Amino acid sequence: MSQGPPAVSVLQRSVDAPGNQPQSPKDDDRKVRRREKNRVAAQRSRKKQTQKADKLHEEHESLEQENSVLRREISKLKEELRHLSEVLKEHEKMCPLLLCPMNFVQLRSDPVASCLPR
């Protein structure tokens, strides 16, 4: 039975830098600083992304409310138009100006008086 290389040397090689050369404490410090800097940058990026999503959500809610207000206004205006159309229709039935045979395109001093019965 032959034994392979000891487990410690395999572990040591996986920790070592490329090329299987041991790292100096200076390299280890650089690696730790780089990882910390990367961790902080990733945290900052996630926070920024969350803030952006929150802002978009607030904007969406605001636009939904504005849309709802505008839809209610449209509904009210449609109802007002319907009502005024009915009023106009009723008025047209008895308006003496519409019944008058004179052409109102011509300028007159008092076109209403000329159509009214005397």
UniProtKB/Swiss-Prot annotation:
Residues 56-84 are annotated as: Leucine-zipper. SUPFAM superfamilies: Leucine zipper domain (SSF57959). Residues 1-69 are annotated as: Disordered. It is found in: Nucleus. Residues 30-55 are annotated as: Basic motif. Highly expressed in CD8-alpha(+) classical dendritic cells (cDCs), with low to absent expression in other immune cells and non-immune tissues. The keyword Transcription regulation applies. Residues 51-69 have a biased composition (Basic and acidic residues). One of its GO terms (cellular component) is nucleolus. Disruption phenotype: Selective loss of CD8-alpha(+) classical dendritic cells (cDCs) and CD103(+) dendritic cells, without abnormalities in other hematopoietic cell types or architecture. Dendritic cells are defective in cross-presentation, and mice lack virus-specific CD8(+) T-cell responses to West Nile virus. Mice also show reduced priming of CD8 T-cells after pulmonary Sendai virus infection, with increased pulmonary inflammation. Mice are extremely susceptible to T.gondii infection, with decreased production of interleukin-12 (IL12) and interferon-gamma. One of its GO terms (molecular function) is DNA-binding transcription repressor activity, RNA polymerase II-specific. One of its GO terms (biological process) is dendritic cell differentiation. Heterodimer; heterodimerizes with JUN family proteins. Interacts with JUN. The increased protection toward L.monocytogenes infection in mice lacking Batf3 suggests that CD8-alpha(+) classical dendritic cells (cDCs) and CD103(+) dendritic cells are an entry point for infection by L.monocytogenes. This is Basic leucine zipper transcriptional factor ATF-like 3. It comes from Mus musculus.
